[in-house]
Amino acid sequence: MSNTGTTGRVPLWFVGMIVGLAALGLLGIFFYGSYTGLGSSL
């Protein structure tokens, strides 16, 4: 894997993927908690 212009740095698509997965994970945990009653107090 050779990404041009991203030597010594993390590729932008990789950062975007990690941020996207983290956001989806947090939303999933929040909605799951609200449905099960754990996050209803938030």
From Swiss-Prot:
Q: Does the keyword Membrane apply?
A: yes
Can you supply one Gene Ontology CC term for this chain's record?
chloroplast thylakoid membrane
Domain of life the protein comes from: Eukaryota
User: What processes in GO biological process is this protein linked to?
Assistant: photosynthesis
Report the main location listed first in the record: plastid
Per UniProt, the keywords (alphabetical) are: Chloroplast, Membrane, Photosynthesis, Photosystem II, Plastid, Reaction center, Thylakoid, Transmembrane, Transmembrane helix
Q: Does the keyword Transmembrane helix apply?
A: yes
Q: How does it sit in the membrane?
A: Single-pass membrane protein
**TM spans, by residue?**
12-32
The listed locations are: Plastid, Chloroplast thylakoid membrane
Which HAMAP family is this protein grouped with? PSII_PsbJ
| NCBIfam families for the chain | PRK02565.1 (NF002722)
Regarding protein family, the annotation reads:
Belongs to the PsbJ family.
**What's this chain's function?**
One of the components of the core complex of photosystem II (PSII). PSII is a light-driven water:plastoquinone oxidoreductase that uses light energy to abstract electrons from H(2)O, generating O(2) and a proton gradient subsequently used for ATP formation. It consists of a core antenna complex that captures photons, and an electron transfer chain that converts photonic excitation into a charge separation.
Q: Give the multimer and partner information.
A: PSII is composed of 1 copy each of membrane proteins PsbA, PsbB, PsbC, PsbD, PsbE, PsbF, PsbH, PsbI, PsbJ, PsbK, PsbL, PsbM, PsbT, PsbX, PsbY, PsbZ, Psb30/Ycf12, at least 3 peripheral proteins of the oxygen-evolving complex and a large number of cofactors. It forms dimeric complexes.
Under what name is this protein listed?
Answer: Photosystem II reaction center protein J
UniProt organism field: Nephroselmis olivacea
Per UniProt, what is the name of the gene that codes for the protein in this document?
psbJ
